[in-house]
């Protein structure tokens, strides 16, 4: 408990030093400068971590840090702006940045894996065609050559001029197979298809990389613009009306002060007011905040559907190729018979028979698919968990933005408190008229108005009971 109290007191002291320097003394100025330099260091570190792909050199980062320190020390609006920008990272702007990161993870994971499996399937088909072209042509032609040579060996040479001429005859059989042309055609086709796939993969990676960087820059620009608009509305001519639905501790003190001075007060709030106004700090959501929470999660659900769709396509392709592997491995071999039929003395028969086996699919050409679920959905789960936490804490972050703003501008805070107090009193002054108008409607809701017989029966039951008591 003492440690918590000590930490709270140190934080409040540093917060007060950051918001308003106490005095122009050197000690207070050094404390103020140290706190501003620390906040600037955290901001620059956060920026460099978010945009690591354009990480500038250390000298440039040091220059940016020094410039940020000077701005924070000299400008109250700059100190408020940088804190509001950090808090805005947890609202819609941070949501958009996380969605962009999740989309990049899906494209780099599932889409690239889909192209990889398609390429493996294409390589398997071309490998099997090449292997079958050799395993079918050459055994068949070899048996055909053996059959021709066997026929040639059965032929009886003519010996009409053995005494005059002698010669030796040999049979040379040369084979011509179109397998080389087929292989060249398959290589050309495979090169064209792989070129198209490579072009698609490179284009997808390039578009993803550029799109992710552009979305990150757009997210940073959106954070800065939205923070600037927030400050403009908060400090504008009608700033006391902007997001003025929070009951702060200063509002409670103001209401107690009004009560001590015998003036109208508004606390505690009634049931209807508690649905609209939020007592800070509070985790209870108003109907407006619930609607905002639903709008916060709507893009998340849309992109989640797209991510699941890509994952389903990747998984179905993986299952399809895996089932094809099992079917290819279970296919029986094909036995080919080469029979040479001849006719001798009017009788036909098989004079030569040879057989060889051909496998339907080469085992070395079976595709091996890849599934990258763990590599993709582990970071996606972290991103989704972060989005859920940010969505649930979005109302709390908005409260923090209001509290930070009023800490830097107490004059605006007093105007907001007075306006909200007067607004609540004005609404309560109109409530009696509404309640008077609402009494007949409440009377119409009673059962005995529509069924007076029930009221008469109840009276008859209560009269004898009263007589017994007498």
Curated annotation (Swiss-Prot):
The chain crosses the membrane at residues 34-54, 56-76, 98-118, 210-230, 293-313, 377-397. Glycosylated. One of its GO terms (biological process) is myeloid dendritic cell differentiation. It is a multi-pass membrane protein. Several domains are necessary for interacting with OS9. The region in the cytoplasmic tail that is necessary for interaction with OS9, is also required for its transport. Interacts with CREB3. Monomer. Homodimer. Isoform 1 interacts (via the C-terminus cytoplasmic tail) with OS9 isoform 1 (via the C-terminus tail); the interaction induces DCSTAMP redistribution to the endoplasmic reticulum-Golgi intermediate compartment. Isoform 1 interacts (via the C-terminus cytoplasmic tail) with OS9 isoform 2 (via the C-terminus tail). PANTHER family: DENDRITIC CELL-SPECIFIC TRANSMEMBRANE PROTEIN. Probable cell surface receptor that plays several roles in cellular fusion, cell differentiation, bone and immune homeostasis. Plays a role in TNFSF11-mediated osteoclastogenesis. Cooperates with OCSTAMP in modulating cell-cell fusion in both osteoclasts and foreign body giant cells (FBGCs). Participates in osteoclast bone resorption. Involved in inducing the expression of tartrate-resistant acid phosphatase in osteoclast precursors. Plays a role in haematopoietic stem cell differentiation of bone marrow cells toward the myeloid lineage. Inhibits the development of neutrophilic granulocytes. This is Dendritic cell-specific transmembrane protein.
């Amino acid at each position: 408990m003492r440690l918590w109290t000590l930490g709270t007191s140190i934080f409040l002291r540093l917060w007060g030093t950051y918001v308003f320097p106490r005095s122009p003394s050197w000690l207070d100025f050094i404390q103020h400068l140290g706190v501003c330099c620390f906040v600037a260091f955290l901001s620059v570190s956060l920026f460099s971590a978010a945009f690591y792909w354009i990480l500038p050199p250390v000298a440039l980062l040091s220059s940016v840090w020094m410039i940020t320190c000077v701005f924070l020390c000299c400008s109250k609006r700059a100190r408020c702006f940088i804190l509001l920008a950090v808090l805005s990272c947890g609202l819609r702007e941070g949501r958009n940045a996380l969605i962009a990161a999740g989309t990049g993870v899906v494209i780099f994971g599932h889409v690239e894996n889909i192209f990889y499996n398609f390429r493996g399937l294409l390589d398997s088909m071309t490998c099997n065609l090449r292997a079958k072209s050799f395993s079918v042509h050459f055994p068949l032609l070899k048996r055909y050559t053996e059959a021709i040579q066997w026929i040639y060996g059965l032929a009886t040479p003519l010996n009409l001029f053995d005494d005059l001429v002698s010669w030796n005859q040999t049979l040379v059989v040369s084979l011509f197979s179109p397998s080389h042309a087929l292989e060249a055609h398959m290589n050309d086709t495979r090169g064209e298809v792989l070129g198209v796939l490579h072009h698609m993969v490179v284009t997808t990676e390039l578009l993803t990389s550029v799109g992710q960087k552009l979305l990150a820059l757009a997210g940073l620009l959106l954070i800065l613009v939205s923070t600037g608009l927030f400050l403009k509305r908060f400090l504008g001519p009608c700033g006391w009306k902007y997001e003025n639905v929070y009951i702060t501790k200063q509002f409670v003190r103001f209401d107690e002060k009004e009560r001590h001075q015998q003036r109208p007060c508004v606390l505690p709030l009634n049931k209807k007011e508690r649905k609209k106004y939020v007592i800070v700090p509070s985790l209870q959501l108003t109907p407006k905040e619930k609607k905002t929470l639903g709008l916060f999660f709507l893009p998340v659900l849309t992109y989640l559907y797209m991510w699941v769709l890509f994952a389903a396509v990747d998984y179905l392709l993986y299952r399809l190729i895996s089932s094809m592997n099992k079917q290819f491995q279970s296919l029986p071999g094909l036995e080919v018979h080469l029979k040479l039929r001849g006719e001798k003395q009017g009788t036909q028969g098989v004079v030569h028979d040879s057989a060889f086996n051909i496998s339907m699919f080469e085992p070395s050409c079976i595709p091996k698919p890849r599934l990258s679920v763990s590599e993709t959905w582990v970071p996606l789960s972290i991103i989704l968990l972060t989005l859920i936490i940010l969505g649930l804490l979005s109302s709390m972050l908005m409260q923090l933005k209001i509290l930070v703003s009023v800490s830097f501008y107490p004059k605006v805070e007093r105007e907001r408190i007075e306006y909200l107090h007067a607004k609540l009193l004005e609404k309560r002054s109109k409530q009696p008229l509404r309640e008077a108008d609402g009494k007949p409607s409440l009377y119409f809701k009673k059962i005995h108005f529509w069924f007076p017989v029930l009221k008469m029966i109840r009276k008859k039951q209560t009269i004898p009971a009263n007589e017994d008591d007498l």
